[in-house]
UniProtKB/Swiss-Prot annotation:
The gene is nsa2. A motif (Nuclear localization signal) lies at residues 10-17. This is Ribosome biogenesis protein nsa2. GO terms for biological process: maturation of 5.8S rRNA from tricistronic rRNA transcript (SSU-rRNA, 5.8S rRNA, LSU-rRNA); maturation of LSU-rRNA from tricistronic rRNA transcript (SSU-rRNA, 5.8S rRNA, LSU-rRNA). Keywords: Nucleus, Ribonucleoprotein, Ribosome biogenesis, rRNA processing. It comes from Botryotinia fuckeliana (strain B05.10) (Noble rot fungus). Transmembrane segments: none annotated.
């Protein structure tokens, strides 16, 4: 017997501890806690190696789960035609189509959702932070700090906006790049109207840009459409509607948008 199998030899000769199963169960139950503890407390190279190991484990686990799911799915047609004749009472039954029906239902639902929330510009170019912000140095000559940023793109601020004190203002939005109105085109009516902007709903670049009210190509803004006289099915006047910016406001000097209907 090879020298490295002494543990197996001992087990064959003397058997296991009487509480072996209980100890194994408890050890397996503690593994989750130990993994969590290591993930939080390890630092440096050991942490990197540990995270790499965990990543590979998770990838393998996901592959295994996917394989199990594919194995359990009932296919729409049998892999090979059956050679045995079916009895009379089974002839009217179709082959199992659970997976096919479920798949088509999910696809239809996704298509409806996509149509409901479709926008004129589904993809936009990413904007780097260097392009979005200009570093502003502040402080005395001997100790200049570079923690302030000036936004180089057009922005929207509400009517009740007040600047923070200069010492605490991290992001500067220049007055010359603040916009209050947008040229909104109604796609069905084919008219373009200048409407006041109410708020910035979503900037596709970054959630922080949404908070700052940055207006870039592809941004979703809410505009006041009360001038258009749109009404709901119940007869109420529509006040605010969403629109997507279709031009580059920093180049054109104006905000052009298409109403989402």
């Amino acid at each position: 017997m090879p020298q490295n199998e002494y543990m197996e030899r001992w087990r064959k000769l003397h058997g296991r501890r009487l509480d072996h199963e209980e100890r194994s169960r408890k050890k397996a139950a503690r593994e989750g806690h130990k993994a969590s503890d290591d993930a939080q407390k390890l630092t440096g190279l050991r942490a990197k190696l540990y995270q790499q190991k965990r990543r590979h484990e998770k990838i393998q686990m996901k592959k295994q789960i996917k394989a199990h799911e594919e194995r359990n799915v009932k296919s729409s047609a049998p892999n090979e035609p059956s050679t045995k004749p079916l009895p009379q009472y089974l002839l009217d039954r179709s082959n199992p189509t659970n997976a096919k029906a479920l798949s088509s239902a999910i696809k239809n639902k996704r298509a409806e959702k996509a149509a409901k929330f479709s926008v004129p510009l589904p993809k936009v170019r990413g904007i780097a932070e260097e392009e979005m912000f200009k570093v502003v140095k502040t402080g005395k000559k001997t100790a200049k700090k570079s923690w302030k940023r000036m936004i180089t793109k057009p922005t929207f601020v509400g009517p009740d906006f007040t600047r923070r004190p200069v010492k605490y203002e991290r992001f500067i939005r220049p007055m010359g790049l603040r916009y209050k109105k947008a040229n909104v085109t109604h796609p069905e009516l084919g008219v373009t109207v200048q409407l006041p902007i109410i708020s910035v709903k979503k900037n596709p670049q970054n959630p922080m840009y949404t908070q700052l009210g940055v207006l870039t190509r592809g941004t979703i803004v809410e505009v006041n459409v009360s001038d258009l006289g749109l009404v709901t099915a119940g007869g109420k006047v529509v006040w605010g509607r969403w629109a997507q910016i279709t031009n580059n406001p920093e180049n054109d000097g104006c905000v052009n948008a298409v109403l989402l209907v």
